[in-house]
Design a protein with these regions (language model features):
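C-terminal functional extensions of proteins
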Residues: 156, 166-207
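Short active-site oxyanion
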Residues: 63-68, 129-131, 155-156
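Buried hydrophobic positions in well-ordered alpha/beta secondary-structure cores of metabolic enzymes
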Residues: 71, 159-160, 198
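Glycine- and other small-residue-rich loops at beta-strand/loop junctions that grip anionic moieties
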Residues: 4, 47, 105, 133-134, ...
């Protein structure tokens, strides 16, 4: 059960009264509201990119018990409380697979996320396929897209919001160029808090 503080509710009402993204559907607006609230910046509404039906697919996966795989502990921590208070989806981080890295040409996060995806998707397929949340590592996002190119099972949703200057926009553009279900924050902006906020917006809609 989620009990919102009056200040949070007042903030959301304020945000809604100032949004101009009229082309978004109900769930997309919910995600946008949370991202504006998290960032304190209305310009976010000009940066969001949704693939068609991405929010609906992600919401259904959460209701079905899909696990959530993040690239950082910070993103996982920001999601866990909401997950525990709603559908109790299990939250995993790439760091859980760091110790198995024998590939020196990959970053720890890229390796951990890809191995985590392989393991979790093997036991959670179809309507329970994992949701992947990336708020830090563009390298992990790029590598994930590469290994999914010929994969049989695909994520229910990818939150692509790595932050930074090197490789970030390229990784996001690469995700947008695919048919993968996605929510992307264009530009160099992003981060664990923003990526987690997108997931939490959908988790709120499960109750």
């Amino acid at each position: 059960m989620v009990i919102d503080h009056p200040i949070f509710l007042e903030s959301i009402r304020f945000i809604r009264s100032h949004l101009i993204a009229n082309d978004l559907n109900y769930l997309e607006k919910k995600v946008l509201e949370r991202l504006v609230h998290t960032s304190g910046d209305f310009s976010v509404q000009n940066l969001l990119n949704f693939s068609e039906g991405a929010c609906e697919k992600g919401l259904q996966a959460l209701k079905n018990g899909a696990p959530i795989l993040t690239d950082t502990d910070m993103a996982a921590a920001a999601i866990k409380t909401m997950a525990e208070n709603t559908t109790r989806n299990k939250v995993f981080t790439a760091g859980m697979w760091f110790g198995k890295n024998n590939h020196t040409n990959l970053t720890k996060t890229a390796y951990g996320l890809s191995e985590g995806w392989k393991e979790l998707s093997a036991i959670n397929s179809g309507s329970k396929s994992p949701i992947v949340v990336i708020g830090s590592s563009p390298t992990a996002l790029t590598y994930l897209i590469d290994i999914l190119e010929n994969a049989k099972d695909l994520p229910s949703l990818i939150i692509g919001m790595p932050v930074g200057f090197i490789g970030v926009e390229n990784s996001k553009n690469k995700l947008i160029s695919t048919d993968l279900p996605r929510i992307v924050l264009n530009s160099t902006r992003g981060g664990a808090a923003m990526a987690a906020a997108a997931v939490n917006a959908l988790l709120r809609e499960t109750i």
